[in-house]
Amino acid sequence: MDAMGERKEHRQGSAAALSGRRLADVIKLVPSFFGFAFVRAWDDLAFSRFAALFPDTPWLGQDIVSLGMLPVFLLVVLAARRLAPLYRRPALVIGAPLMMVAAVVFYELSLGLPDGAQAALVLAALLAGAGAALSILQWAELQSCLNSLQIVLYVSGSFFLGSLLGWMALDAGPERMAVIMLLLPVLSLFCLKAAFAKIAQADLPKSDWGAVRFPWKLVIVLGVYEFAMGVTQGGTSFGADAPVLGVLVASAVLFCLAFFFSHRFDFTRIYRTPFVLMVCGLLAAVLSFSASNAVANMLVSTGYALMFLLLTMLLCDISHRYGVSAALLCSIEELVMFSGVGGHLAVQPAVQAAVPPLQDGVVVSISLTVLVVVASMVLLSEREYSRWGASFFGVGSRDPEGDAQAAFVRRCEELAGQHRLSPREKEVFQLIAEGKSPSEIEGELYIASGTLKSHTRRIYQKFNVHSRGELIALLQEKEG
């Protein structure tokens, strides 16, 4: 066998070994997959049930559920330093599934209460929103304990499985639907407990943190996508399955890229180079008013789902690297969903009558296109996501260790930029600087031993050092 054939066989063997390692790692944290998937499925089913109460304006039922989420997200944003981490507070851990179960009970009771049905339904919707919001934030804390590639795998995999389970259960009869919705929160709670039990102590969410930059501009772009989604949902031709299919497509693509191609594909480029998101946004805004409603709705839903998934993964990664509360970061992200409520209202007859230009589909389409273009240009103007937004998380008490960790990460990024390291080399460099062993680095980045040696050799060459000790000494010298 010639040298080229040997290298090819080695690459194939390495890829197979890495896929096996990923599969074993996924199986190790199975509760993370199923637990969050159960919450996503319950969330989709709850939105669907309340939307069905308003056949002419299904978005109204969804907005009432969203209204129940609002106080939870606001409270966490305003009092994160006192509340986080949420998973350590038994009242919140038990309260989330209890509210979800209570929402199902009140919904079922409303069917037999002709006099108080409306009040029971509103209470059920608000409880559903509050319970789901608390549960989502606790799962965000769990996902922030994982490394970057695991975050992509678990977030995308859970969204896919949850949307699939919810979609498959939509046709269940009333009795079966009630049983399913009563079981899902309980199962999710057990999975949450089991998942946190498997997390190493060093990786658990911190109770305090220092200052870190927040990607405000990405959140603004997500808000634009949400508004476009809301405008499309508010139309009479919007397909009920479009959001689910959009999530399935976006999450499946991200999962497959991470699972099968991460050893050859630089996955960090997906959220650092948002050109694809700009294209999705433009197509979503323009084609949502085309003659092909099915295609347009699918583009809108997929574009929004992709943006939401990528931002969720980025925020969990920021939380993992800097120690900032994932509940805080994801609460801010979730608050932008209320721009979708504005989109729903913008296309309603009463609003269109008050604002005549909104009656013209072409005007609305052009306006959305301009919004998406401007937002995408702002996003594309930033080269490093660590520079996005403004530093405001340091207000109030600060954890010296959190500040030290943030400073350490920034120092690594500065040195990596000065020596022109590739994205993968930056990851290897930071893990070496953290004192991780070669086997730990291989496991965290899912790379073969030969690949790690190759990256390490190039890093040494670019820094003009000859050993790990010299590299760490150089980092400490810069620190001093």
Residue ranges and their predicted role:
Residues 132-146, 307-322:
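Intracellular juxtamembrane helix-capping segments at the cytosolic ends
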Residues 97-114, 277-290:
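C-terminal ends and interior cores of transmembrane alpha-helices
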Residues 39-50, 71-72, 191, 195-197, ...:
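Linker/hinge segments immediately adjacent to helix-turn-helix/homeobox DNA-binding domains
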Residues 62-83, 253-257:
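Central cavity-lining transmembrane alpha-helices of secondary-active solute carriers
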Residues 147-170, 330-345:
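Glycine-rich segments within core transmembrane alpha-helices of 12-TM secondary carriers
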Residues 397-456, 462, 473-480:
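Helix-turn-helix DNA-binding segment
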Residues 23-33, 85-96, 147-156, 210-219, ...:
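Membrane-interfacial loop-to-transmembrane alpha-helix junctions, especially the N-terminal start
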Residues 117-135, 294-308:
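Hydrophobic core of transmembrane alpha-helices in multi-pass small-molecule transporters
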